[in-house]
Amino acid sequence: MDPNCSCPTGGSCTCAGSCKCKECRCTSCKKSCCSCCPGGCARCAQGCVCKGASDKCSCCA
């Protein structure tokens, strides 16, 4: 389960604008789900992997 969300790891969720999901795929938020993703990344909602705040996430590299 995602520590920042109520959905299972790898699952899909529909979070509010303050989405902080890291282990699941948020399908509703327009903001970055990973802290290292740029806010305008259109592919973040498809799921991304973040190794650290200063790293680039896998979907927006």
Curated annotation (Swiss-Prot):
Metallothioneins have a high content of cysteine residues that bind various heavy metals; these proteins are transcriptionally regulated by both heavy metals and glucocorticoids. The modification Phosphoserine is found at residue 58. One of its GO terms (biological process) is cellular response to cadmium ion. A divalent metal cation 1 binds at residues 5, 7, 21, 24. A divalent metal cation 7 binds at residues 50, 57, 59-60. A divalent metal cation 6 binds at residues 37, 41, 44, 60. The modification N-acetylmethionine is found at residue 1. A divalent metal cation 5 binds at residues 34, 36-37, 50. A divalent metal cation 3 binds at residues 15, 19, 24, 29. Monomer. Residues 30-61 are annotated as: Alpha. A divalent metal cation 2 binds at residues 7, 13, 15, 26. A divalent metal cation 4 binds at residues 33-34, 44, 48. GO terms for cellular component: cytoplasm; nucleus. Pfam families: Metallothio. Class I metallothioneins contain 2 metal-binding domains: four divalent ions are chelated within cluster A of the alpha domain and are coordinated via cysteinyl thiolate bridges to 11 cysteine ligands. Cluster B, the corresponding region within the beta domain, can ligate three divalent ions to 9 cysteines. Residues 1-29 are annotated as: Beta. One of its GO terms (molecular function) is metal ion binding. This is Metallothionein-1A. Belongs to the metallothionein superfamily. Type 1 family. Keywords: Acetylation, Metal-binding, Metal-thiolate cluster, Phosphoprotein.
